[in-house]
Every structure is written in C-alpha cells, then in structure tokens.
A protein has these predicted regions:
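Alpha/beta-hydrolase superfamily serine-hydrolase fold, recognizing
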Residues: 25-343
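Gram-negative bacterial Sec-dependent N-terminal signal peptides
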Residues: 1-21
C-alpha cells in the first residue's frame, strides 16, 4: 500500500471505535443512503483507533481522505492572511467569490475535526461551496489545534478574528457590519459559543449562525452517541478523546462556551438567528437537536433540519459532495446566508 492510500485507510481508522453499537451494521443498514454505505465500507476496512496510529501530524489523515476525491474549486480566489487582535495572532484564509454583486458581507468559518484533524486544506471545498453559493467573502480561522492548546484558546482566537473582521473588513473588500458565522462539528460548537461570547461582550454583531452537525455538550452520553457511535465515520471514543484534551477539567464542561447546551434560557435570549443541521446516523444528532429546541424556547429564530440517510460531517466529506442530502444542506445554508446578509 503506498503512502497516500495508507493515510486514506488511517482516515477511516481515525474515526472508528470498539464500542458496541445499537444500530445495524452500516454495511447493511437500509436507513443509510447507498452512496454513504459504500463510503463507510471503504473507510471501515481499518478499525484501529486513531490515537494509537503513527502519523506525521493528525491533519494529514483527514487531508488524505479528502484528497482522494477530485472537487470543484473554481469561482474563488484565496489568500493567506495573519491577523493580530486582542493580543492574539491568528492565521486566516480569505476566500473571495469571483462573481460579486455590490459589497459582500463576511462568512466567518470555524472548522471541525475534533480540534485535532481539521484545517483549511481539508475544509476548503466546503468553504468554497458556501462562498460561491452565498456571494459573501469567506474568512477561515486556522485556530491552534490540540494538543498544542486547549479551551479557551481556540475560541478566543476565533473571537479575535471576529473582532478583526468587524473593524477591518474594508481591507478585504467586505462590509464588517454584515457577518455570519458557520462551523461544522466542533466548529459548530465554537460557532454557538462565539455567538454567546459576542452577545456577552456586546459585540461584534453576528447576523446569522450556522451550526452544521454541531457538538453542543461535552457529556458524550446521548442515545445517538450509543446508537451511532461506531462504524459511521465519527466515533464516540474519538469525540471523548478530543473532549478530554480540549476541556479536561470536568467543572469547565459546565461553561456554556464549552457546552452551549448547558446555557440557561436567559443566556440564550437575544442570540442571532440560527440554522441547525443534523444527520440521522450521527452521534451528535441528539445534542444538536436539543440545542435547537433550547434556542427556540429562548425566543431565537431557528431552523432545525435533520438530513436522513447520511452521517456526521456529510457536508464536509468530498466523497459525499454529490449525494442529494449534501447538496440540499449546502443549498439551505447558502440561502440562509443570503437571506440574512444581503441587503
């Protein structure tokens, strides 16, 4: 097996677990789209836990998996930019649509990957789809990954970029008064937390938040975790591994900036409109939907949609880009961005 293919195999291994699952074998589960089943069959060939495998750096594992599928990266131009704000220096990537009508707003994107395996390289296709579909300028936060730093570093870096964008958007040709924030998986966690933080700190104003298959609680103990926590790309054990590094102190996990689901109704009041996307066969499904309900109970305008037949991070995975559920979710997200950011 050559090096590239080896890393593709490790990508599947990185997200497997030995926990028993209540759901049927994903290879035969009729609730899963056939294209998704084929993807799972390929990555499930190696069942070794990610953290026991050698790798030059964790991000290379997901990047190798993503690189296996050719994708369309046309219609955008991307530049790297390092910003300094609030005493923090953060690398970002600025992605501009080639076709722009008027002055665009900003889509601040916070990536997933359990704070370990994500980066711009393996998330750029998703950001490209959101930028082209919405017509807004994307700003990708390349926060410090685990284990180099833990909470609140990654969130504070994201807030620093949000603040910089609101004050310096003219430098990238955007309107800093129109900002949406989006994130997938733990990026969805930090999108929710950043919305709370911006409210608590009286700005910058966020006009729209998009939580894609978000992690909203550190407990790792919902019904969907136990039902779908093995064999479906993201595992319960891998999430627990990430949480133990990100927020090792149990007391810290009660902080709404760590577990947004534990925020009080009062704390959630006044948050920006939200789109919460979940997947039927995803360990994070229950907590994402519970957070959407809690937002609604707090009077927040929220659209919550579960996409059946698919798995965690389906919007991110290049191999699933042309599956109807992925296309529909991205179309829904970009429509929401346009609705809330386009004057």
């Amino acid at each position: 097996m050559n090096k590239t293919l080896k890393f593709v195999a490790l990508a599947g291994a990185s997200l497997m677990t030995s926990f028993a699952a209540a759901a049927p074998n994903p290879a035969t589960d009729a609730r899963i789209d056939p294209h998704v089943r084929a993807f799972l069959a390929e990555i499930n060939k190696d069942s070794s836990p990610f953290w026991e495998l050698p790798q030059p750096k964790p991000q290379d594992i997901l990047t190798a998996l993503q690189s296996k599928t050719p994708v369309d990266m046309s219609g955008v131009t991307t530049t790297e930019k390092t910003i300094t704000e609030n005493g923090r220096t953060v690398k970002t990537y600025i992605m501009k649509p080639e076709k722009v009508s008027g002055k665009p707003g900003v889509l601040l994107f916070i990536h997933g990957g359990v704070w370990l395996v994500g980066n711009f390289q393996n998330h750029q296709r998703l950001l490209r789809d959101l930028v082209v579909g919405s017509g807004q300028i994307g700003v990708f936060v390349e926060y410090t990954p685990l284990p180099a730093a833990k909470f609140p570093t990654q969130l504070e870096e994201s807030y620093a970029v949000l603040k910089w964008v609101s004050e310096h958007a003219e430098e990238i040709g955007a309107d800093g008064g129109r900002i949406a924030v989006a994130g997938n998986s733990v990026g969805g966690n930090m999108t929710a937390a950043l919305s709370l933080m911006a409210k608590d700190r009286n700005g910058p104003k966020i006009g729209y938040q998009i939580l894609m298959i978000p992690a909203t609680d550190a407990s790792v103990d919902t019904k969907s975790y136990h039902e779908y926590g093995t064999g479906r790309f993201l595992s319960r054990s891998f999430m627990k591994y990430g949480w133990d590094l990100y927020a090792p102190d149990e007391a810290t996990r009660n902080n709404p900036y760590v577990s947004p689901l534990r925020a009080s109704t009062e704390q959630l009041k006044g948050l920006p409109p939200a789109l919460v996307i979940t997947a039927e066969n995803c360990p994070l499904r229950d907590e994402g939907e519970a957070y959407a309900r809690k937002l609604k109970d707090a009077g927040v305008q929220v659209d919550a949609v579960r996409y059946n037949g698919t798995i965690h991070d389906f919007v991110l995975l290049n191999a699933l880009r042309n599956v109807p559920s992925t296309q529909a979710a991205i179309a829904q997200a970009t429509a929401g961005i346009r609705e809330h950011l386009v004057p």
